[in-house]
C-alpha cells in the first residue's frame, strides 16, 4: 500500500538574529544604505552574508544610516540567518569575505524582537577638525583641515551645550528627509582640543538627515567668530534652514557607537574601536538614563 503524499507545508527554517559590531572607512562608499548603481556598505555586507547563508534573501538593518564618505567605529547591524554557523564565528567568517575597508569586530546572537535601529536609545557621533596651519597628509582622510586662524573651542562648547534637550532642529535637516518631524533629543556633547585637533562629539536619541555636518559648519563659524553664540542659538531655535547652507566635509565624521538598554558587545571592544586620533585616556561615556518612550522613537 502506497502512502499518501503529505499536503503539509514544508517546515520553515528556524531563524536566528545576529548582531554585528562593524567598522568601516567610508571614503569608498555611497553611505550605509543600499543604492542603485553605487557601492554601499549595506550591499557589500549583505553579499558577504549571502555567501555564508545562501538559502534565503538577506536583509540587514543598522543603528545609523551614515552618508557617503562618513566612517563608523562601532556601527551596529543585525540580520537573520538560518544556517548552523555559531554567532561568534560570523565575525571571522565575514572578515574573510569583506574588503579591507569593512571589518566586523564582534558578532553575537540577540533575541528575535531586538532591532539594531529601533532598540537603540542613542547614537554618538564624533567630528575631528584639524586646526593646524599646514595640512597633514596622514590626517586628511579622517579630519576636516580648517585654518583661517585658531578656532575658539570654548565658544564652540558653549554653543553646543545650549542644544542639549528635546528640540526641533529643522534648521539642521537636509531636504529629502523622510522623517515626519524634525524633533530629537540631544543627550550629551563634548568639545575638546588636543594640540591642533579639535574633537566634537554629539550624542542623541536620533539624528536628522545631514544634521551633524550642517551643525558642524555652523559651529566652526562660531569658533572663527563669524557667528556669535547668540546668533547660532537664534538660528536653530527659529528653524532658519535658509541660513544654514554649508555642510562640513563627510571625511571628518565618524559614527562612534550606538547604545542600548543593556550591553550588547564586550566593553573591551570599546577601546579597540576608537579611531587612532582619539585621546588615549578615553573611557566609554556612561549610558544615559531611560528616556521616555516618545524620545526613544526619535530615531534615524
From Swiss-Prot:
One GO MF term: tRNA pseudouridine(38-40) synthase activity
GN (gene name): truA
Active site: 67
EC number(s) on file: 5.4.99.12
A single GO BP: tRNA pseudouridine synthesis
Organism the protein comes from: Synechococcus sp. (strain CC9902)
Function: Formation of pseudouridine at positions 38, 39 and 40 in the anticodon stem and loop of transfer RNAs.
Binding residue positions for substrate: 125
Entry superkingdom: Bacteria
Matches recorded under InterPro entries: PsdUridine_synth_cat_dom_sf, PsdUridine_synth_TruA, PsdUridine_synth_TruA_a/b_dom, PsdUridine_synth_TruA_C, TruA/RsuA/RluB/E/F_N
Record's catalysed reaction(s): uridine(38/39/40) in tRNA = pseudouridine(38/39/40) in tRNA
Known partners and oligomeric status: Homodimer.
SUPFAM superfamilies reported in the protein's UniProt record: Pseudouridine synthase
Sorted UniProt keywords: Isomerase, tRNA processing
Similarity remark: Belongs to the tRNA pseudouridine synthase TruA family.
Catalytic EC class: isomerase
PANTHER family: PSEUDOURIDYLATE SYNTHASE, TRNA PSEUDOURIDINE SYNTHASE-LIKE 1
The protein's name: tRNA pseudouridine synthase A
